[in-house]
Curated annotation (Swiss-Prot):
SUPFAM superfamilies: Carbamate kinase-like. Pfam families: AA_kinase (PF00696). It catalyses: N-acetyl-L-glutamate + ATP = N-acetyl-L-glutamyl 5-phosphate + ADP. GO terms for molecular function: acetylglutamate kinase activity; ATP binding. GO terms for biological process: arginine biosynthetic process via ornithine; L-arginine biosynthetic process. It comes from Methylobacillus flagellatus (strain ATCC 51484 / DSM 6875 / VKM B-1610 / KT). Catalyzes the ATP-dependent phosphorylation of N-acetyl-L-glutamate. This is Acetylglutamate kinase. Belongs to the acetylglutamate kinase family. ArgB subfamily. The record marks 32, 251 as: Transition state stabilizer. Keywords: Amino-acid biosynthesis, Arginine biosynthesis, ATP-binding, Cytoplasm, Kinase, Nucleotide-binding, Transferase. Its EC number is 2.7.2.8.
C-alpha cells in the first residue's frame, strides 16, 4: 500500500500529464529508436510500454528503428569488417543482404513483438512494403576534396515517401514500426540512415514531434555539457569546430530539416533513461536538446 507522500507524488505526476494528453491528442509523434534503448532488456520494455501508453491516450506514435549494433555483431560473426564514411555505413551487395536480414527480420520483428506483448498492435514494415519509401543512390562529398563524390554502395537517400500506408495504419489503431530500407525505381534496395528516414517521415506526416533517442543526454559541447537548445547558426558553428561529427551529423541534419519543414518540436534525448519518451512527451521536465529552425 502506498504511503501518503508517495501517493501524492504519483497523483501529481498523473495530473501533470493531463494537459499534454489533451494537447497531443490525435497528433503524430515520430520516434527514432536506437542506441542502448534497443539493447538493454529493461530499457526495451520501458520503451515498448511508453509507446503503447502514448497510443492508448490518443496519440499516433510512429517508430523508425536503427540496428547498427546488431548489424555489426553479425558482420563480425561472418568475418566482415564494417566501414563508415561521415556516419554512413559503406554497403556492398553482401552487406546489404545482411542489413535487410537484420533490420527487416530480426530487429523489426523483435520491436513489434515487444509492443504487442505490452498491449499494443504493432505492424512491422520496411520501405518495400507498399513501396512507400522511394530511394536513390547516395553519393557522399569527399571532405578533403569537395569536388569529388564518393560511392558508398547500396546506401540511399530518400526521393519520396508515400504516407498513405502509415496514415491507414494510424487510423486503424495500429503502431507502425519501420526499418529504414528504401527501394529505387529499378527495384534496387537501399540502406538509409534511420535518422534521415525518421526526419523525412515526420515532415511528410505533418508530425507534432520528432524524437531521436541516443546514447548521450542530448547534444554536448566540447566540455561534455548538455546543450538544451540549438539554432541553425549554432549547429553550423559546432560542425565547423568539430564538436559535431560522425554519427551525430546525420542526426542533427535530419532534426534541423524536420524543424525547418514545420515539425513543431524536434528533440534529441537520452535513450538510456528509463521512460525517457514519457518524460519528454507527458511531463514539464523536457529532457535532451531541442532543435529549432530559427
Amino acid at each position: 500500500m502506498l504511503n501518503q507522500t508517495t501517493a501524492a507524488q504519483k497523483a501529481q505526476t498523473l495530473a501533470e500529464a493531463l494537459p499534454y494528453i489533451k494537447r497531443f491528442f490525435d497528433k503524430t509523434i515520430v520516434i527514432k529508436y536506437g542506441g542502448n534503448a534497443m539493447t538493454d532488456p529493461h530499457l526495451k520494455e520501458c520503451f515498448a510500454s511508453d509507446v503503447v501508453l502514448l497510443k492508448l491516450v490518443g496519440m499516433n506514435p510512429v517508430v523508425v528503428h536503427g540496428g547498427g549494433p546488431q548489424i555489426n555483431e553479425l558482420l563480425d560473426k561472418l568475418g566482415k569488417k564494417g566501414e563508415f564514411i561521415q556516419g554512413m555505413r559503406v554497403t556492398d551487395e553482401e552487406t546489404m543482404d545482411i542489413v535487410e536480414m537484420v533490420l527487416g527480420g530480426q530487429v523489426n520483428k523483435e520491436i513489434v513483438n515487444l509492443i504487442n506483448r505490452n498491449g499494443g498492435k504493432a505492424v512491422g514494415l520496411t520501405g518495400q512494403d507498399g513501396n512507400f519509401i522511394h530511394a536513390r543512390k547516395l553519393l557522399v562529398q569527399d571532405l578533403q576534396n569537395p569536388s569529388n563524390m564518393i560511392d558508398i554502395g547500396q546506401v540511399g537517400e530518400i526521393s519520396g515517401i508515400d504516407p498513405s500506408l502509415i496514415q491507414f495504419l494510424d487510423s486503424g489503431d495500429f503502431i507502425p514500426v519501420i526499418a529504414p530500407i528504401g527501394v529505387g525505381i529499378d527495384g534496387q534496395t537501399y540502406n538509409i540512415n534511420a535518422d534521415v528516414v525518421a526526419g523525412k517521415l515526420a515532415e511528410v506526416l505533418g508530425a507534432e514531434k520528432l524524437i531521436l533517442l541516443t546514447n548521450t543526454p542530448g547534444v554536448l559541447d566540447k566540455t561534455g555539457q548538455l546543450l538544451t537548445g540549438l539554432t541553425p547558426k549554432q549547429i553550423d558553428d559546432l560542425v565547423a569546430d568539430g564538436t559535431l561529427s560522425g554519427g551525430m551529423l546525420p542526426k542533427i541534419s535530419s532534426a534541423l530539416d524536420a524543424a525547418r519543414s514545420g515539425v513543431k518540436s524536434v528533440h534529441i534525448i537520452d535513450g538510456r533513461v528509463e521512460h525517457a519518451l514519457l518524460l519528454e512527451v507527458l511531463t514539464d521536465a523536457g529532457v535532451g536538446t531541442l532543435i529549432t529552425a530559427k
